[in-house]
Amino acid sequence: MHARMSVEIPQQDVMIVTGMSGAGRSTVGNALEDLGWYVVDNLPPQMLKPLVELAGRAGTSLPKIAAVVDVRGGDFFSELRDILHTFGTGPRLRVLFLEATDAALVRRFEQVRRPHPLQGNGTLLDGIAAERARMIEIREASDLVIDTSELNIHQLATTITEQFSGADDAGVRVTVMSFGFKYGTPADADMVADMRFLPNPFWTPELRPLTGRDKAVSDYVLGQEGAEEFVHAYARALAPVLAGYQRENKRHATIAIGCTGGKHRSVAVSEELSSLLRALPGVAVSTKHRDLGRE
């Protein structure tokens, strides 16, 4: 008898791309393909484990592998749970989940005039609700969640390029994102900080038309009592968190900084926090201002 072969961990990066129907899985697959990944679209969940095993074979010539999967082909979570139990999580095996609001998904399905794959004889919202309920455990098991509600296909492709190109040696990719609470808290945020404890430059006429990127606004915001103290204390508090992410092989983190409209305080603080986090070892930082220009 032949001895039973031991399980090999993936030798290439393997990413499982999933999420809500209409949230942009195909766009992400195309973007990864442009970055040199070998992309398998609409892979049946039952084929996930053989694909990961293939990536674990020494000498395989496949590049980085991405499998785009939805929930229609079987019990996805049981398959995913089996894979994570067998191979473990780590820098070579990741799960990317694409999220979007109900309103954004309804708008996209209506634009293409197609039914939701799970709506059956019900409404479009019924299908979305059914899928969202199925995906709760998968979302919680994901390494990275991207909310595509406010992104068009070009912006989503750019986001994927920023996240997955050219920094394989970075321990953690951190996105510092400013936002306005009146537009909703980012669904993909790992941590959220509220800047509404600071005076609002909106009520200063000469600052109102400017943004937190402008020096006058930045000086005003960071010059308020407690502002600089908060930013530096928050950066110090994040340092051991991000170091822990690296130890646990969590390669992405989104830190959301909010104010009322996402134009002044959150933008200024996000820029300052980003500059401090860039000094941390093993951390690659990008800064995004989700709601600039919405007013």
UniProtKB/Swiss-Prot annotation:
N-terminal signal peptide: none
InterPro entries on file: P-loop_NTPase (IPR027417), RapZ-like (IPR005337), RapZ-like_N (IPR053930), RapZ_C (IPR053931)
SUPFAM superfamilies xref list: P-loop containing nucleoside triphosphate hydrolases
Role summary: Displays ATPase and GTPase activities.
Family: Belongs to the RapZ-like family.
Keyword ATP-binding found: yes
HAMAP family from the UniProt entry: RapZ_like
Binding-site list for GTP: D70, V71, R72, G73
Protein name: Nucleotide-binding protein CMS1991
Pfam families in the cross-refs: PapZ_C (PF22740), RapZ-like_N (PF03668)
The keyword GTP-binding appears for this protein: yes
Residues given in the record as ATP binding sites: G19, M20, S21, G22, A23, G24, R25, S26
Gene Ontology molecular functions: ATP binding; GTP binding
Sorted UniProt keywords: ATP-binding, GTP-binding, Nucleotide-binding
NCBIfam families (UniProt xref): PRK05416.1
Top-level taxonomic group: Bacteria
